[in-house]
Amino acid sequence: MKILRKNHPLLKIINHSFIDLPAPSNISSWWNFGSLLGVCLMIQILTGLFLAMHYTSDTTTAFSSVAHICRDVNYGWLIRYLHANGASMFFICLFIHVGRGIYYGSYVLSETWNIGIILFLTTMATAFVGYVLPWGQMSFWGATVITNLLSAIPYIGNTLVEWIWGGFSVDKATLTRFFAFHFILPFIITAFVLVHLLFLHETGSNNPSGLNSDSDKIPFHPYYTIKDLLGILFLLMALMILALFFPDILGDPDNYTPANPLNTPAHIKPEWYFLFAYAILRSIPNKLGGVLALLLSIIILAAFPLLNTSKQHGLIFRPVTQTIYWIFIANLLVLTWIGGQPVEYPFTMIGQIASVIYFATIIVLMPVSNTIENNIIKL
């Protein structure tokens, strides 16, 4: 079996990626979230496949087809809630994975990092088009508001919006194409994941100390397969508790009302994992400026490898940047809270301050603290 594992053309790839892969001996549980994201992706594809068997992407029957899945399909309610809450678990793991990458300086592996940003954007796009499919009030108005942002693009904006809608408003054509996008994008994500792993295995993984670990490697199996399995058990336990006991806690009550173009909800807001970006979008009074800020809130992650001037790897021995990092995380939570609040004083003011802090920590404070710490080392 050992000979076959190492010589067979297909098994050899799996062996070098998951069995005999040399891994640093000191990587902590923060490194588990990559494998957890893989599990989340598999859960989403499988539950999504079963949902697609019963869902109809037509404006007249979409809402009732989701109700039919929950009421008449065997364990349809469970599949639906696993899929909906699986998306939340996916984004929790994604945020922690990116946060760990920033804290431990994983962005120095720039190819892996940049593919990760593309993955982040693609996952956000997938979640957005997926949220439209149940055709509830928030689905319809969320789709209308977010797609309408493209009209801010000079010259081609209005044409582009009508092209995406497939008409002059969000309607049957929009729902059908969003369903098509939602079905194909997870497979594109899977392809990008393989590229992400390819680049990661070219350079080897980072580790908490930030030091070169070439002299101290251990095989991935059994050490990290067991560790990942423990993480997967915790993930599945959290997902099942969420889906079985609190299935609607992260959803919006408005989405249990069928879409009505003549009745606008009091507060249009996206799912919780988009609220930080939505708060940044709303904090800028100009439409085009808001759209650019929204895009920059994610794309700015690509600036980390470019702005990194530190002589040390990661933040483990850098108290100044550590403090700024935790300010950044706290600020992100504030933005998430503000994104779910109505557009009125003092929320607008807090949102604007938090948006400035968000960009300032990445562009100004972290590079400045890098320079300060480099000078301290010289003393």
UniProtKB/Swiss-Prot annotation:
Matching Pfam families: Cytochrom_B_C, Cytochrome_B
GO biological process, one term: mitochondrial electron transport, ubiquinol to cytochrome c
Subcellular location: Mitochondrion inner membrane
Cofactor requirement: heme b
Membrane topology, as annotated: Multi-pass membrane protein
Keywords of this entry: Electron transport, Heme, Iron, Membrane, Metal-binding, Mitochondrion, Mitochondrion inner membrane, Respiratory chain, Transmembrane, Transmembrane helix, Transport, Ubiquinone
Binding positions (heme b b562): H83, H182
Residues reported in the UniProt entry to bind a ubiquinone: H201
GO MF annotation list: metal ion binding; ubiquinol-cytochrome-c reductase activity
SUPFAM superfamilies associated with the record: a domain/subunit of cytochrome bc1 complex (Ubiquinol-cytochrome c reductase) (SSF81648), Transmembrane di-heme cytochromes (SSF81342)
InterPro entries in the cross-refs: Cyt_b/b6_C, Cyt_b/b6_C_sf, Cyt_b/b6_N, Cytb/b6-like_sf, Cytochrome_b, Cytochrome_b_C_euk/bac, Cytochrome_b_N_euk/bac, Di-haem_cyt_TM
One GO CC term, this protein: mitochondrial inner membrane
Family: Belongs to the cytochrome b family.
UniProt function note: Component of the ubiquinol-cytochrome c reductase complex (complex III or cytochrome b-c1 complex) that is part of the mitochondrial respiratory chain. The b-c1 complex mediates electron transfer from ubiquinol to cytochrome c. Contributes to the generation of a proton gradient across the mitochondrial membrane that is then used for ATP synthesis.
Protein name according to UniProt: Cytochrome b
Organism in which the protein naturally occurs: Akodon iniscatus
GN (gene name): MT-CYB
